A protein has these predicted regions:
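N-terminal cap/lid segment of alpha/beta-hydrolase-fold proteins
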Residues: 3-47
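Short, surface-exposed "cap/lid" segments of acyl-processing enzymes
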Residues: 42-89
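Conserved acidic catalytic loop of the alpha/beta-hydrolase fold
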Residues: 118-139
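Alpha/beta-hydrolase
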Residues: 177, 181-286
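Catalytic histidine-centered segment of alpha/beta-hydrolase-like enzymes
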Residues: 322-334
């Protein structure tokens, strides 16, 4: 049995994991999507593994959320590959290594908010079509994190025949406060005092390293914060992020992220609406949230759970000692394991 150590490398030698990189044409001809694929090398012919596709959140791309090795161990993609999955992660348009519009790097306030939720769902559809063309499997598993749960949920509610299981980590749902306070929670740049429309936000926003760290561990005692995400681990992760989404290079003290999701937070989520209907999801669904998540608190997962009336099976779990970003923290392997076991289960 292959064992994965939360705080270090594999207890036994890491099996060789093959990695592939693809540039997937988007449904929008101006968009090209970066897709990463990991699997056990030489284990089974292509297409024999179960398929899982990871969908990232509002600020950080899949490249560094799902495939950055932490604490001397492997990444989430590595973990899934070692356990027999064809594991994929992609960057939504404007994020990471996917194509960016001209507004990127030319001033964050230029243009309309880029990469709104319907755009991200279109990117996921292009990825699913590409992956299904490479495998005989008719259905894929989806794992979404944060905003990625709205993307994956929106896809599953529209294309349920293509989805086997879906896992929602730190799921986003309708916000129980005003647009300004919602933006204060989510945005890491200056918040306008009055927001009548998300279109006022501009195409991109900047996020500083110091603000990203503060938001990650806010509400935690300093010693607990250092245990969950040691400063040295955060610094290494930030360098990887800045290398693909920074204003300059890996030494950059700030990164840029599209504002489409922020516009949706103002126009939709904080206005008492949602971008998808959980009632339309038919696949078995697992919701996972950390007990210290202040970005998407447990009430959001509870409300989604109550609306999953069409799901053939549903489960909600609160994981101890985890924040909104528990996928990158010291206890992350508990999250990995629960996700894997759910995806490997056949529900009747």
């Amino acid at each position: 049995m292959r064992n994965f150590d939360a705080n270090g490398p594999f207890r036994t030698a890491l099996p060789k994991v093959a990695v592939d990189y693809f540039r997937v044409p988007g449904i929008d001809p101006a968009v090209t999507i970066h897709l990463r694929h990991k699997r056990l090398a030489g284990d089974l012919p292509r297409g024999e593994h179960p398929v899982v596709i990871f969908v990232h959140g509002a600020t950080y791309p899949g490249t560094v959320v799902f495939d950055h090795a932490m604490f001397g161990g492997g990444s989430w993609l590595d973990y899934m590959a070692v356990h027999g999955f064809d594991a994929y992660s992609f960057d939504v348009r404007g994020y990471g290594l996917s194509s960016r519009p001209a507004e990127f790097g030319e001033g964050s306030r230029r243009g309309l908010p880029y990469a709104r939720t319907p755009d991200a769902i279109a990117d996921l559809k292009a990825v699913v079509d590409f992956v299904r063309a490479r495998t005989p499997r008719s259905k894929v598993n989806l794992v979404g994190w944060s905003w990625g749960t709205a993307i994956a949920g929106g896809f599953a509610s529209k294309y349920g025949e293509l989805v086997r299981h879906i896992v929602m980590v730190s799921p986003l749902w309708i916000i129980r406060n005003s647009p300004v306070s919602a933006m204060s929670r989510w945005m890491t740049s200056a918040v306008p005092t009055l927001l009548q429309s998300g279109d006022l936000l501009g195409a991109y926003r900047s996020i500083s390293k110091s603000e990203a760290r503060r938001r990650w561990v806010r509400g935690l005692e300093p010693d607990v914060a250092e245990q969950l995400m040691p400063r040295a681990e955060f610094d290494g992760w930030w360098r990887a992020l800045a290398n693909v989404q920074g204003n300059d290079d890996e030494s950059s003290e700030s990164v840029e992220a599209p504002n489409g999701v922020m516009a949706d937070l103002v126009d939709v989520w904080s206005a008492g609406q949602a971008t998808y209907t959980p009632e339309s999801i038919s696949s078995p669904t697992l919701l996972l949230v950390g007990e210290w998540d202040v970005d998407t608190p447990a009430y959001m997962a509870q409300e989604i759970f109550s609306r999953l009336k069409g799901a053939s099976y549903k489960r909600l779990e609160v994981l101890a000692r985890g924040t909104h970003s528990m996928a990158l923290e010291v206890n992350r392997v508990d999250l990995y394991r629960r996700t894997r076991e759910f995806l490997q289960t056949r529900f009747i």
